[in-house]
């Protein structure tokens, strides 16, 4: 955790402070909340499909007809894998990517903190990540494997930032514990 790496907090500069100082743009936040959230099965397939349908139905509006892209922060790797399958089933043409690190990479440290982050602990195999990478390769004409995961990660980073004009961008990126802080993408305007 941050406390383990840096010890006690010296100062807090919150997003509300950054907005007030005009260092970042403000947010348009839309909340969708059920009547009673206790006892929700977040892995319920019907629930997940309804959420995916909502995202796809509102996607063009949210991303200004593809001018921007979206990021879906997901709670766990098994949940990400299920959402990935659902999105591919509901809309096979959406340019979707997914990024998480699998157990075989768990010895790698995060560049800035020196600690592991975003790693799958739930019996996730390299094969499951490779299936996602194969879809990505077919969509974008790349040839990434789990052996060159860092190149795949870098490619996703560039596509999300829409930095290269000749590089086709991603529409939607599914993540677990990654791409959430310190990620500056001017063309990313929607966070689920």
Label each region the model flagged:
Residues 40-175:
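Conserved C-terminal RecA-like helicase domain
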């Amino acid at each position: 955790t941050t406390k383990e790496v840096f010890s006690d907090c010296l100062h807090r500069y919150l997003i509300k402070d950054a907005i007030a100082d005009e260092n970042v743009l403000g947010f348009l936040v839309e909340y969708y909340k059920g009547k009673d959230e206790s006892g929700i099965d977040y892995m319920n397939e019907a629930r997940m499909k309804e959420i995916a349908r909502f995202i796809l139905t509102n996607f063009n509006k949210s991303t200004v007809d593809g001018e921007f892209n979206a990021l879906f922060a997901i709670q766990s790797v098994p949940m990400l894998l299920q959402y990935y399958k659902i999105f591919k089933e509901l809309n096979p043409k959406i340019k979707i990517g997914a990024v998480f690190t699998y157990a075989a990479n768990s010895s790698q440290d995060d560049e800035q903190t020196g600690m592991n982050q975003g790693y799958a602990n739930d019996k996730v195999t390299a094969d499951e990540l490779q299936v996602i990478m194969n879809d990505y390769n077919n969509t974008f004409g790349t040839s990434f494997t789990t052996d060159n995961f860092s190149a795949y990660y870098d490619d996703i980073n560039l596509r999300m930032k829409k930095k290269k004009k000749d590089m086709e961008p991603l529409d939607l990126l599914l993540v677990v514990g990654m791409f959430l802080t310190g990620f500056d993408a001017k063309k990313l305007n929607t966070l689920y």
